[in-house]
Amino acid sequence: MKKVYAGATRDRKEFRFHRNLFKDLMQHLQAYGLRTSNMDIVDKPPTEPLRVTFPVNEDVVPRDYQVGLIDFLGDFSLRTKVTNLQTGKGKTLSALMAMVKIGMRTAIQLRGGYVSRWIDDLEGLFSFKKGDILVIRGRDALLSLINMAKADDLQAKVIIITNKTLYKLFEEFEKDGSDNYYGIRPEELYDLLRAGLRIVDEVHEDYHLSFRTDIYSNVSSSIHLSATLDTEDVFRRQMYDIALPQQYWYKGVEYDKYIQSYAMFYATTSESLSKLKLSERGQDSYSHGAYEKSILRQKVLKDTYLEICRYPIQRFYIENDWQGGQKCIVFCYLVEFCVVLRDYLRGIYPELNIREFVAETDEKVLKEADIIVSTIKSAGTAQDIPDLKVSVLTQAVRKKEANIQTLGRLRKLKRWPNVTPVFVYLNNTSIETHTKYHEAKKEIFQGKVLSQREEHIPLRL
């Protein structure tokens, strides 16, 4: 399904384009004989936002390298601000300290799965009173928020709104126009809320929605957070350049290299290779899901592959001066395979707490487990895993953003400052696609890791 980076009502009486395309739109219309002298062009400034104070806890002190970023994000004269700060360097804290600097009611836009983490951060940084934070999830909750604002009964300083909730607002407006369920036009929302600042978390994940939020909102200032806005997708890069032009990116923090990367090679016998599926039925492109499914269907292959997956865990996590409290995460593709690998590892390491982390899993697993088995979709982005020493990527993945986000789960080990976090990815040298992905990773990780090493696993699939 194609995504259109514009908006229109179903009756086609209204069309919406990003404000940064205004000059291009005017030139386009004039090329078709439509003169600006025959147009009514209205520049509507946002309503005066509600000024508020945020009670910062006394022990909250930004790091030296965050000070310049906070000043940049807190510049209210800039309508759009972007930070592509690497994971673990405090994007959330920097954005919230900029919020303090701006001192206006703030709306935070994010995926529903990140709400609890943001609430934890807000409550850890500020001494909020009951009612200062409001979470809006679902159409009924949004309608209640709108009605509170209309009745001048809105007290919250921070309003958290999930992406899907905003999506429904835009969808229903495009279908029903002004006569919609919510009783407002989308561009009236921030004016009604008197929110002067919008913070968008992990903007790269639901970028189409974030783009559409821009064309359907009239907010004074926005802060966009991500660690992976660097993309090789040409079209996506063009869309980034429209809504998030490079001149609005903060580039004052040098990349901190503290991870050691290992490519772990293994090979497959010709007999086994003939039994492996490398693509889904009817498709030509490589599918790691098909690869794992074909392995799970054959006991000998499954047993060997499970041991291949265990090898880097034993090598870098268990044998490399393991200490209680240190964690390891393993990324697979299929949830089914996560469960199978979890059970296999439990049989070998009964003394360790080994858990899977997939959809609907409680986030406390990330804090309690010694070894976590997960997927890139579940734990590869925006998850903070304390004391993570080793990350093992079993899935062959090419996409630049996925590789950087997965690498970024590793943070400096505060409790063991002399221990270097290790990132391992498996690579089947008998499969051409895996080899190409390995070459791509070498380029992607250049300048982002201490060094890139290669080792061979003494097992054949």
Which residue stretches match the model-derived regions?
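Conserved two-lobed SF2 helicase motor
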Residues: 152-174, 367-381
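Conserved RecA-like P-loop NTPase helicase motor core
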Residues: 355-444
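Conserved Walker A/P-loop ATP-binding site and its immediately adjacent core
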Residues: 87-126, 333-338
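Conserved interdomain hinge at the start of the Helicase C-terminal
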Residues: 281-330, 340-343
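Post-DEXD/H (motif II) to motif III coupling segment of the RecA-like Helicase ATP-binding lobe
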Residues: 194-197, 202-263
